[in-house]
Amino acid sequence: MWPPDAEPEPDPESAHGPRSGRTVPGLRALLPARAFLCSLKGRLLLAESGLSFITFICYVVSSASAFLTVPLLEFLLAVYFLFADAMQLNDKWQGLCWPMMDFLRCVTAALIYFVISITAVAKYSDGAYKAAGVFGFFATIVFAIDFYLIFNEVAKFLKQGDSGNETTAHRTEEENSNSDSDSD
């Protein structure tokens, strides 16, 4: 445990290299699982972070840096949520409402990207601004798809919870009405 031993035990595999069936631990443990990256949520988060980074680079190259903060912030948030979902931090930190945070992140990103993309395309004639505006529109679409899917999942979850409460409430009412009729 901690503190580490002065002399760690020798690894029997170190002389021969790792076995064919086992992976080498280390920085690979921080990489997201392939199954998550191939899922719809993983692909959306990868697209969000990629488009945010490209938009950020386009604004860096352009002459004014008024819109530089939004793509950088959204890139960092998308990478954070990608890492959090891949490492299943939402299961470990139950106190945070992860779907609501992700939903608010996507809604605000879609709205802000839409506004700055319209401004960049309409107001500036620089090619980097035009490219940033186009990538911003693509990012708006990806963020909108993500918040639509999150909204549907949350609505389905809440609907299932309400139907479960209604059936137990209905059963309780039936039991109370049956017990009242028996006592008369």
From Swiss-Prot:
Keywords carried by this UniProt record: Chemotaxis, Cytokine, Membrane, Transmembrane, Transmembrane helix
Record-annotated MARVEL domain positions: 36-155
TM ranges: 64-84, 96-116, 131-151
Main location: membrane
GO molecular function: cytokine activity
Keyword match Transmembrane: yes
Pfam families, per database record: MARVEL
Biased composition range(s): Acidic residues: 1-12, 175-184
Chain segments annotated as coiled-coil in the UniProt record: none
GO BP annotations listed: blastocyst hatching; chemotaxis; positive regulation of B cell receptor signaling pathway
Chain spans, region Disordered: 1-22, 163-184
InterPro entries on file: Marvel, MARVEL-CKLF_proteins
GO terms under cellular component: cytoplasm; cytoplasmic vesicle; cytosol; extracellular space; nuclear membrane
Domain of life from the UniProt record: Eukaryota
Compartments, record wording: Membrane
Membrane protein topology class: Multi-pass membrane protein
Family: Belongs to the chemokine-like factor family.
Protein name: CKLF-like MARVEL transmembrane domain-containing protein 3
Origin species: Mus musculus
Organismal lineage: Eukaryota, Metazoa, Chordata, Craniata, Vertebrata
